[in-house]
Amino acid sequence: MATLGRNVTITLIGHGTFHLTTPEGRNILIDAWVDGNPVCPEPWKARVRENLAAIFVTHGHFDHIADLVDLARETGATVVCQYDMVPYLEGEGIPAAQLVGFNKGGTVTVADVRATMTTAHHSSTIYENGQIINLGTAAGYVLRFSNGFTVYHTGDTCVTMDMQIIGELYRPDLVILPIGDHFTMDPRQAAYALKLIGAKYAIPEHYGTFPILTGTPEALIEHCREFGVTTEVIALKPGESVS
């Protein structure tokens, strides 16, 4: 398995939830599906709550925000999200001072990380009390750490030419992207996305949790060969880390 060597630790909690530790030792979460996540290792259900500084939210589907409100209340972590999700979270009892809402193209600094919100082509709704609630639009993030290491989390999305622009503008070292198919891009689309982005490393996510998510890291690697992509694919199992 690759060693990043950049003093940033990235752990797959399961499905689309990731835990990152910054060079300063700050802990951040990308999406928050923990307690009911069928592939989350039991020790991580407590560990994600330890010294949690921030939670970055890509969109409002249950498999990305099921534990968001509880974690924010318990830990006091700053919640970073697309602007139109803020009123819903305030209504759930998260103080305005704990919320950082912004939009595509904007950049904020939270927990020593400069985060730029990017486009993701996906929906962002939840179903509560017999109603569909719109929680803004889906997003991705470019996360730039204090030592220059840069991670691009695409969010749930299909492949898009925006990824080429992001690759040219931000030169991400590592990409986190979905490969499961059905609700997001499949391994072949993801391989083409990696061709557009040009990062050194990639971590696949959002596959295998349910039978309908049929994409595999092996298929991603195969299609990377098809497109001449040299990005190294790091296939983490839930609970595994790379640093």
UniProtKB/Swiss-Prot annotation:
<dbReference type="InterPro" id="IPR022877">
    <property type="entry name" value="UPF0173"/>
</dbReference>
<comment type="similarity">
    <text>Belongs to the UPF0173 family.</text>
</comment>
<dbReference type="GO" id="GO:0016787">
    <property type="term" value="F:hydrolase activity"/>
</dbReference>
<protein>
    <recommendedName>
        <fullName>UPF0173 metal-dependent hydrolase Caur_2542</fullName>
    </recommendedName>
</protein>
<dbReference type="Pfam" id="PF12706">
    <property type="entry name" value="Lactamase_B_2"/>
</dbReference>
<dbReference type="InterPro" id="IPR036866">
    <property type="entry name" value="RibonucZ/Hydroxyglut_hydro"/>
</dbReference>
<keyword id="KW-0378">Hydrolase</keyword>
<dbReference type="InterPro" id="IPR001279">
    <property type="entry name" value="Metallo-B-lactamas"/>
</dbReference>
<dbReference type="InterPro" id="IPR050114">
    <property type="entry name" value="UPF0173_UPF0282_UlaG_hydrolase"/>
</dbReference>
